[in-house]
Amino acid sequence: MNIEDFDYHLPESLIAQTPLKNRDQSRLLVLSKDTGELTHLHFRDVIHYFEPGDTLVLNDTRVMPARLFGLKEETGAKVEMLMLTQIEGNDWEVLLKPAKRIKKGHRLNFGDGKIVAECIEELEQGGRIMRLHYEGILQERLDELGEMPLPPYIKERLDDPDRYQTVYAKESGSAAAPTAGLHFTDDLLNKIKQKGVHIAFITLHVGLGTFRPVSVENIDDHEMHSEYYQMTQETADLLNKTKESGKRVISVGTTSTRTLETIRRDHPQFVATSGWTDIFIYPGFEFKAIDGLITNFHLPKSTLVMLVSAFSNKKYILNAYHKAVEMEYRFFSFGDAMLII
């Protein structure tokens, strides 16, 4: 399959730069995955598509204020560090700008020494493994010194960093938000529960690989980035019970989907587990975990467009995207949502 098969034209003016005042006032495009029929609603209306006994799966990861600005100890040169993934202990994979002159053994100083990062390994494309030295709790140091990392297509500064977190964000570790969840309010979640719909949580820490463009023409040759995930016994039991009773598992976001499908690929049922997934979902993939998907509108030629095309089909997805462009839906992280069911 060719990468060009997943392209569409998107006017830059439709890339949402700021969130709407109210999370659930975004628009919702409902796509029947089997017929391609489209329905235009608002996100708060999503509750009408849930039935008692269904389970809604949310990713409770929390975005770290992981962009740090500091100085190179040896020269005093300014440097920017974006923390991506915790490797082990205090060792982190990071992106540096500028990276060229940061070699193994060099040290970076942030906040007058409140965080010191020592380079222990050089990677490709500006990547490094850095060993962090700090006093106290890392999250507290990051809250004090760090800024929220926003996707490269968002050019405006975010007035309220909490708007790039879901209302249920809990487990710190992501470099980007699981954006399908940004539309939910506490009130909407309570109404969903009152309807008899179960709420379950998984954790997948989103890396910047989610924004990395596919660089090969044949998508079979693409190598996915790895991301850390975990599922509790409580969630596994609830999902197994949902499936056994003939009810539906509705996944909120591609991150939840990748977690659920990874676990069901590797096990005959849902189990409590954790690990790293590089699952690549594209047309031809056999879904074993999810029955519905809530997701935002994704970048042209991205692996996420491929994932939603696999869940419905490419023709229906591209038709929905063209209709969304025509009707001036808002796209990407702060944009509108789709329900594919």
Curated annotation (Swiss-Prot):
<keyword id="KW-0671">Queuosine biosynthesis</keyword>
<comment type="subunit">
    <text>Monomer.</text>
</comment>
<keyword id="KW-0808">Transferase</keyword>
<comment type="function">
    <text>Transfers and isomerizes the ribose moiety from AdoMet to the 7-aminomethyl group of 7-deazaguanine (preQ1-tRNA) to give epoxyqueuosine (oQ-tRNA).</text>
</comment>
<comment type="pathway">
    <text>tRNA modification; tRNA-queuosine biosynthesis.</text>
</comment>
<keyword id="KW-0963">Cytoplasm</keyword>
<keyword id="KW-0949">S-adenosyl-L-methionine</keyword>
<comment type="similarity">
    <text>Belongs to the QueA family.</text>
</comment>
<dbReference type="GO" id="GO:0051075">
    <property type="term" value="F:S-adenosylmethionine:tRNA ribosyltransferase-isomerase activity"/>
</dbReference>
<dbReference type="InterPro" id="IPR036100">
    <property type="entry name" value="QueA_sf"/>
</dbReference>
<dbReference type="InterPro" id="IPR042118">
    <property type="entry name" value="QueA_dom1"/>
</dbReference>
<dbReference type="InterPro" id="IPR042119">
    <property type="entry name" value="QueA_dom2"/>
</dbReference>
<dbReference type="GO" id="GO:0005737">
    <property type="term" value="C:cytoplasm"/>
</dbReference>
<protein>
    <recommendedName>
        <fullName>S-adenosylmethionine:tRNA ribosyltransferase-isomerase</fullName>
        <ecNumber>2.4.99.17</ecNumber>
    </recommendedName>
</protein>
<dbReference type="InterPro" id="IPR003699">
    <property type="entry name" value="QueA"/>
</dbReference>
<dbReference type="GO" id="GO:0002099">
    <property type="term" value="P:tRNA wobble guanine modification"/>
</dbReference>
<dbReference type="GO" id="GO:0008616">
    <property type="term" value="P:queuosine biosynthetic process"/>
</dbReference>
<dbReference type="Pfam" id="PF02547">
    <property type="entry name" value="Queuosine_synth"/>
</dbReference>
